[in-house]
Amino acid sequence: MITGSIVAIVTPMHEDGSLDFPRLRSLIDWHVAEGTDGIVIVGTTGESPTVSVDEHCELIRVAVEHAAGRIPVIAGTGANSTAEAIALARYAQQAGAVAHLSVVPYYNRPSQEGLYQHFRSVAEAVELPLILYNVPGRTVADLSNDTALRLAEIPNIIGLKDATGSIDRACDLIERAPEGFALYSGDDMTVAAFILLGGHGTISVTANVAPRAMHEMCAAALAGDAAKARTINARLVGLHRHLFCEANPIPVKWAVQRMGLVEGGLRLPLTPLAESFHDRVLTAMRQAGIQA
């Protein structure tokens, strides 16, 4: 089981929107040096909706190849077509990812039984360990705790990223989940509490900007050191909040560009961060001790 701070890494792009693989490789090196515990490639923060299937597969391949075992790479493979989700998962397994993260199918609004059948079909088609991803604020469909725990009975479904932000739901999951089933927070603002209550880590947006601090906060929480986790988190609250002042990943890509880590490329329909938000993101970065 991977524990701690797993970054939902941004996808570097040139100003014209083309993929920037040299910057991706340097970002991976930086996360290794900063202590990040794992990488999710081509997730929501990695702009998965606007990359082609070929680009999606190439991003997975390059990330796994360049990480070269120095840091675990989890491949984002979600789709609202079960057949496409299976195809992406098969490629992730072939490329050598340690696991894959599959989001609740969006837009077509399946029932709980439809969600169960979708994820079961993916898990049965591919041996690669599968982490469920519930983010109802984006998908509309909401994977209930009961359905998630039913899916947890399938051997290669190994965990869940819970991005509901609900501590009540997290407590229920932590209490009822089988031993060895990994629970990750997908809500940076509640990560410390989530782990202190018994969660195993986070798949984080903030870790793109403050990877060492996120690693240290998670490590403290996993060790049961609530005071240390709280102290570190206090410096990061501004980032947790203002990296979502516009739709993710717009603010976080602006922040990592300010840090000199990537160019400013985004793909439509995403547009650059509105100037009115620049100061609040910069202030949050400085509060976290980040020079930009």
UniProtKB/Swiss-Prot annotation:
Organism (species): Azoarcus sp. (strain BH72)
The keyword Secreted is assigned to this record: no
Binding site for pyruvate: 45, 203
Domain of life of the organism encoding this protein: Bacteria
Catalysed reaction equations from the record: L-aspartate 4-semialdehyde + pyruvate = (2S,4S)-4-hydroxy-2,3,4,5-tetrahydrodipicolinate + H2O + H(+)
Keyword Ubl conjugation: no
EC number: 4.3.3.7
Similarity field: Belongs to the DapA family.
Protein name per its UniProtKB record: 4-hydroxy-tetrahydrodipicolinate synthase
